[in-house]
Regions:
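DNA target-recognition patches
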Residues: 20, 32-66, 238-242, 250-253, ...
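Non-catalytic DNA-recognition/assembly elements of restriction-modification systems
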Residues: 1-31, 159-260
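Short, positively charged
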Residues: 117-146
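Short helix/strand-bridging catalytic loops that position acidic/His residues to coordinate divalent metals
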Residues: 60-68, 105-106, 152
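Short, well-ordered loop/turn elements at secondary-structure boundaries
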Residues: 38-40, 73-77, 103, 149, ...
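A short beta-sheet element
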Residues: 69-72, 80-123
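Short Ser/Thr-interspersed hydrophobic loop/turn segments at strand-loop and sheet-helix junctions
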Residues: 20-30, 44-52, 73-90, 123-134, ...
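A short glycine-rich beta-alpha junction/loop motif
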Residues: 99-107, 138-161
């Protein structure tokens, strides 16, 4: 496995330490929660949602059935490492992760020295580290990383000046990203205030304006079911737009282009494909 070769390479470096030497690593107990109606209970994020750019709470858990709930929240000076499924992905903790119940499928990485936070984040974001995390002896075959595995991950430690420079840049990137998310939330709030939208309107509309149509009536008359016409949230959005000044996207942009389809041939190349 390629990852195992990276492990050997890192362990050959004289200036390497174990991840467990630099951080406390732990994992909450497995959680089997009971869901509640939207807006009631404790907001919950899955591992996938934690890595989303714009996550939305889709599941709310009944508080009495969340054991040791205080251990399932995260702090902004921590790192989170995916340990199940697609292992080895790392993320910083951002403002929208706070005050949410976070799945046990993410290991909590708590730096022992705050000065090493930036270096740890930068190093663990590299493809080099991800290959290490996915190495066979660390669970690549079973797609799972235990706390004991993560503690043994080799971390290369260059000179203090190098780590400080890279670490400060990484920390600044995290702070600026956090600021950008806050500014985006403010922009959305301003837009909602301007058009008179309410963030809870979608939930209210689905219960208040949702229509019911007989499938037999549709099939009998060979009609086409346009779901937009029967979803209250969509109708609300249409009404909000019609009540405001608006214009077509084509009139507001210089061009709208859709590239043609092309046949892809995969192989060794310097051209990445997304």
């Amino acid at each position: 496995r390629d990852g195992y070769g990276f492990v050997l390479l890192a362990n050959q470096c004289k200036n390497h330490v174990r991840l467990g030497d630099l951080a406390d690593i732990w994992q909450p107990s497995r959680l089997t929660g009971y869901t509640m109606p939207d807006g009631k209970g404790l907001p919950f994020f899955t591992a996938g949602q934690v890595f989303e750019d714009f996550p939305r709470v889709r599941k709310w858990l009944a508080a009495p059935f969340v054991p040791q709930a205080d251990t399932r929240y995260v702090k902004q000076d921590w790192l989170l490492l995916s340990c199940s499924g697609v292992v080895g992905n790392i993320t910083a903790v951002y403002p929208h992760h706070l005050d949410k119940i976070i799945t046990h499928d993410l290991l909590r990485i708590v730096p022992k020295d705050a000065n090493e936070y930036g270096w740890l984040y930068a190093y663990m974001k590299t493809n080099f580290f991800k290959q290490i995390a996915q190495a066979a002896q660390y669970g690549h075959m079973i797609k799972h990383i235990e706390v004991s595995h993560a503690s043994e991950f080799p971390i290369i430690m260059p000179e203090n000046d190098v780590r400080k420079t890279i670490g400060e840049t990484a920390r600044r990137a995290v702070l600026l990203r956090s600021k950008s998310w806050k500014m985006r939330d403010e922009a959305f709030s301003t837009l909602e205030k301007h058009v008179g939208a309410c963030r809870d309107s979608a939930t209210q509309s689905q219960t208040a304006n949702q229509g019911e149509v007989s499938l037999a009536a549709i099939l009998q008359n060979r009609l086409r079911l346009d779901a937009d016409s029967f979803v209250g949230a969509i109708k609300d959005v249409d009404e909000l737009i019609n009540a405001c000044d608006w214009d077509y996207l084509g009139n507001l942009t210089s061009d709208v282009v859709e590239p043609t389809r092309f046949k892809r041939f995969y192989g060794e190349s310097d051209v990445p494909f997304v």
